[in-house]
Amino acid sequence: MVTIKINNNVHIILEVIYLPRNKQYKKNKQDKISETTLNSDIAGISIFAFGAFAAVSMFFTSFTGIIGNGMKKLLFTLVGIGAYIFPILLMFIGVCYLIKKGKITFSKRFYGVNIIIINTLMLIQMQKLSLYYNGNILDGIKKIYESSDTFHGGVISYILDVPIYKLFGKGYFVLFITLYIISFLLVSEKSAGEIIRENLKKKPLKKTKPSVDETKTMDYENDNKDKDETLAKKISSKIKIVDFMKNEGNVDSNKGQALEEIAVYDSAEKNENESKVIGAELEDAIGQTSSNNSDITYEFPPISLLNVNETSKLKKSDKKELLSSAEKLTETLNSFGVDAKVIQVSKGPSVTRYELQPSAGVKVSKIINLSDDIALNLAASGVRIEAPIPGKSAIGIEVPNKDLTAVFLSEVIQSETFSNSKSNLAFALGKDIGGNCVVTDLTKMPHLLIAGATGSGKSVCINTLIISLLYKCAPTDVKLLMIDPKVVELSVYNGIPHLLIPVVTNPKKAAGALNWAVNEMTKRYKLFAENNVRNIEGYNDLYTKNKVESKLPWIVIIIDELADLMMVCPNDVEDYIGRLAQMARAAGMHLVIATQRPSVDVITGVIKANIPSRISFAVSSQIDSRTILDTSGAEKLLGKGDMLFNPVGESKPIRIQGAFINEEEVERVVGFIRNESTETQYKEEIIEQINSNVSKSEGDEDELLEEALKIIIETKQASTSLIQRKLRIGYNRAARIMDQLEEKGYISAKDGTKPRNILVDKDDL
């Protein structure tokens, strides 16, 4: 406390409070920090608000008043087309102010992006310089201000471009390219030398003379090769060769190579004798079946209508070639440090599988990654690696054969596997790599999806399925419902007694046929409930016990091209197929669907989830393979019937060479059935129901269709939004009107973002 005496009567008392020096400094610093933060927040919010207002002014001028209009005009005058980027840049800077609290340090990438923008605006303005510059810069500025065209660089770019053009002339491109290169270097944050070195690493240089280190490596590899050959001669290796023709015989050693105890299995003569016996038994069984049913006049076609495979058996030279390829494969793997040996070679119709047994400690992934190197050393177009082979502790390397051998349908039908199958819906697929005939049962699938590129073998596979059913089942046991939007594929089967109705070729009628199938499925389930049975087998057992009047046949629904149906009526087709796939199994109805376009808009999630069994032929990409099989591999197939079969319950797909049947064989079998059977009687009630559904759908025209047609002819525009605005209707109704106009041929189909073409005029009306 301090007392100050001014005179005898007046005294001033001052009380001074002393603070420690460090506390006083901290208080001042905190005040400054809070003040700086507040200022940066105010600045950031102001800049962001200004940028947001500028953005609204650019896109919604009517909402921002006089200031917004003036700002839009000013921005277009100053920076031209860059006016659309300017508000975004301002809002970005405002956000940075708020986050960084006013301490903004922009990176080189930010400056690089800005140089690209400025350089682009200058380049745009340079292209239009002759429109604005006539020798007087001010006149050009006035023209830019008064111009209604916004596609220019603005006054700033104009002022910069005029001296550049006067100094450099047409050589201004060099300057702009230089600025682009500099900006790209700033954005990439790499030097030009680094970029050049990275590109040089990707392109190996040709070396005319090997270096000393390379010479040592080559000598070392040659020594290793000699050691491997000596080791191979010492080790007694057992390589089992399995030919799909099942030939027996021993192979002589080739030029002193000591491959001891090579087990070669051959049973061609035995198989030929067995096939003759089985064929005779099959024909006897067919005769008994047709004679036991007195009411049926169906006569099964004989095996002689099908072509016989006359392919020669595997020669000794071919076996020597297989052994040589097995040695090359082992040497290739050894050169990459993979210790493995070939334990079996299986020669299939289209590919040969080498079964490898890797040593302990060798990773499977290491062998998979060497697929390209294996194909190079074996001079193959490509290899497929199956790791591991299901049921074996081995890795399969599938190499395409030089000469493809066809598998004829007669071979599989005469096989013991087909004749012993008791199912009515068993059909022949082909042969696997080991030469075993593959016969599958449609009742266990219970539905099948077939996909593949054009010419890969889908139609042949469907023909083998149908012909197999004709050899296996009478019309009272199995009925067929065929849908063929391509018209020419399945029409040959018209007239056989197995068909419920003639082959459906109209896509709209196809939707009606599927609708009938759904209704039939519902009727069968009601029938099962009335008789206390769960499925078609239980109901037919009641028929054998004379407890019901009629027997229910199995129904196989075959769709040859799903993509065409999905284009015409996708919603209905997807719903019907989804319901059938979910519920039709117990009712004795099975789907076989084929498509050559395995995209997700054709094979939808609903269809894919309810059809677990799939066959994939050769496809063009790995994406298509994953769409069909949920795994890759189909893109490496060879075509011509080479397929991957993934039945329900199997963890991995099986590679099969599909059975082949040509058009002449199909016509012979179908012609025999037509001639020997009674006249086919189609279900008229099904045909009437389908036709009524089609006529009903065609008669559902919108009442505003004619008015919409007049509008698009007068305006010369055809769009859903136009009809929606003019007629004041909802989007769904306007879209349906557009679909009806397209169906009637008044407008063209939709082609991406391009406008539809109007195909009629006033005279046509």
Swiss-Prot record:
Q: How does it sit in the membrane?
A: Multi-pass membrane protein
GO molecular function (one): ATP binding
Binding site residues for ATP: G455, S456, G457, K458, S459, V460
Protein keywords: ATP-binding, Cell cycle, Cell division, Cell membrane, Chromosome partition, DNA-binding, Membrane, Nucleotide-binding, Transmembrane, Transmembrane helix
Q: Where is the FtsK domain?
A: 435-626
Q: Kindly give the InterPro entries that the UniProt entry links to this protein.
A: FtsK/SpoIIIE/SftA, FtsK_alpha, FtsK_dom, Ftsk_gamma, P-loop_NTPase, WH-like_DNA-bd_sf, WH_DNA-bd_sf
Mind listing the GO biological process terms from this record?
Answer: cell division; chromosome segregation
**GO CC terms:** plasma membrane
Entry annotated with the keyword Membrane: yes
Principal localization? Answer: membrane
Q: Where in the cell is it found?
A: Cell membrane
Which purpose does this protein serve, as stated in its record?
Essential cell division protein that coordinates cell division and chromosome segregation. The N-terminus is involved in assembly of the cell-division machinery. The C-terminus functions as a DNA motor that moves dsDNA in an ATP-dependent manner towards the dif recombination site, which is located within the replication terminus region. Required for activation of the Xer recombinase, allowing activation of chromosome unlinking by recombination.
Q: Which family does the entry's similarity section mention?
A: Belongs to the FtsK/SpoIIIE/SftA family.
Domain remark from Swiss-Prot or TrEMBL: Consists of an N-terminal domain, which is sufficient for the localization to the septal ring and is required for cell division, followed by a linker domain, and a C-terminal domain, which forms the translocation motor involved in chromosome segregation. The C-terminal domain can be further subdivided into alpha, beta and gamma subdomains. The alpha and beta subdomains form the DNA pump, and the gamma subdomain is a regulatory subdomain.
| Name assigned to this protein | DNA translocase FtsK
According to its UniProt entry, this protein's organism is Clostridium acetobutylicum (strain ATCC 824 / DSM 792 / JCM 1419 / IAM 19013 / LMG 5710 / NBRC 13948 / NRRL B-527 / VKM B-1787 / 2291 / W)
